[in-house]
């Protein structure tokens, strides 16, 4: 039996607890990176992104030529539907949480806001991250994986 296919023992049983919107957004704000899911050639594409949560919006930086930037720019003012996922999972304890935000992503164009977010969001890679994208959450879901309260 491979390690990934082991059955959970009663001591390691876990349960899933649904998070409300406020708790999910608070947890999302507690980490600095996640994954943005967008459409590329009519198929889902996923990229890691560092982020901030400001005034209920998820803010990230990307390159002008990055696929996610191209998708956002191609939608003009309407925005493009994306999902953003972040988590904090402990594989050893089999606990943690995951949050998914789905909403419209638009390019931040106000020069003062762009400058502010560029100061606050530091790229992880050695490339010019010249585009700031804001995701306005429409749907916010989340789960917390905790020790099963029914386990003795």
Curated annotation (Swiss-Prot):
Entry-linked SUPFAM superfamilies: FMN-binding split barrel (SSF50475)
Source organism, top-level taxon: Bacteria
Induction: A member of the dormancy regulon. Induced in response to reduced oxygen tension (hypoxia) and low levels of nitric oxide (NO).
Pfam families, per the entry: Pyridox_ox_2 (PF12900)
Gene3D superfamilies reported for this sequence: Electron Transport, Fmn-binding Protein, Chain A (2.30.110.10)
Protein name: Uncharacterized protein MT0087
Organism in which the protein naturally occurs: Mycobacterium tuberculosis (strain CDC 1551 / Oshkosh)
């Amino acid at each position: 039996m491979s390690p990934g296919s082991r059955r959970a023992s009663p001591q390691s049983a876990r349960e899933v607890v649904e998070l409300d919107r406020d708790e999910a957004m608070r947890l999302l704000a507690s980490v600095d990176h996640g994954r943005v899911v967008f459409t590329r050639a009519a198929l889902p594409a996923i990229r890691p992104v560092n982020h901030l949560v400001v005034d209920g919006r998820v803010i990230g930086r990307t390159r002008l030529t990055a696929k996610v930037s191209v998708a956002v720019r191609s939608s003009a003012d309407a925005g493009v539907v994306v999902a953003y996922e972040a988590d904090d999972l402990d594989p050893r304890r089999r606990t943690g949480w995951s949050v998914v935000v789905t909403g419209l992503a638009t390019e931040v164009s106000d020069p003062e806001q762009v400058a502010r977010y560029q100061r606050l969001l530091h790229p992880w890679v050695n490339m010019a991250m010249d585009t700031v994208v804001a995701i306005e959450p429409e749907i916010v879901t989340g789960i917390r994986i905790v020790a099963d309260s029914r386990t003795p």
